[in-house]
Amino acid sequence: WDEDHIPDQQSGMVNDSKSIEHSDTDSAKLVNTKEVNGEKHHIYELNFGCIGNNSVRVNYKLNGEDKFTQFEFNVLDKLSSTIETHSDFVATQTQDNDTSSPTYGIYSDWYFASGKDSTQRSHWGDDWSHDNINFMAMKNYLDPKASEVESIEEYLVDFMWNSYMKNSHDTFAVANYLSDSGIYGGGANPYSRTYSEVMEATGFFNMYRIEKAYPNLINYRKSAEWYLEKAYGIYSNRVSASPIGFYGEQQIPDMIEALYAEGLTDEGDNLKVLFA
């Protein structure tokens, strides 16, 4: 563990105060009835048997006619538990681990009803799976788990750099859709959106920070500097302040400091010019 690079673990960084304990069974208990301006208000205590979406239907009569009102509650577990559960699910369930697959290493989109997205070749982009790497990398920078960091390596090295971006190593373009990527396309400048490229750049940068903070966590396949170079390459070639406003810019000061720390002074100066 490298104390100089481990992020501050502030108490309260993950706020569990809004979570509730769910019971084994659903229940509704009338606890009080109040009359306000001539109207009766019945107050119930609700216990939900599962996390996620819960529907509550209240049946009543109005002027002798049957009526109902339906409420929708999204019940959360503790946020810390939810984050851990989600990162484990992304790594163990959504990632393509078939080494013979063209999308080996991808974090696929997932639907509750049908599982992995079977149409991701045409639907994949800045509004879809590009954001999964941001969650996984930042979570493991703050709370590392060896198997998940190995999963991130598989995504960034095998999938993103070696396959998805294989035709754009010089341009650093990140295709917005899977169908236009190096896996299925041949161009060095595929259709892209800056939002997609920022997501991948921050994924690479946070992997750099993971390796700097926890150098002995796993046997890393690439150096920390390798990931920093990819993050810088995307930002310097594909991103600027004008088209996306403040999207993703919160990490640029940290990236500039990292470039200087690694002796990449010209690169750090260049990002300053681009985003000052």
Locate predicted features.
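Extended acidic/polar, glycine-enriched regions
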Residues: D2-T82
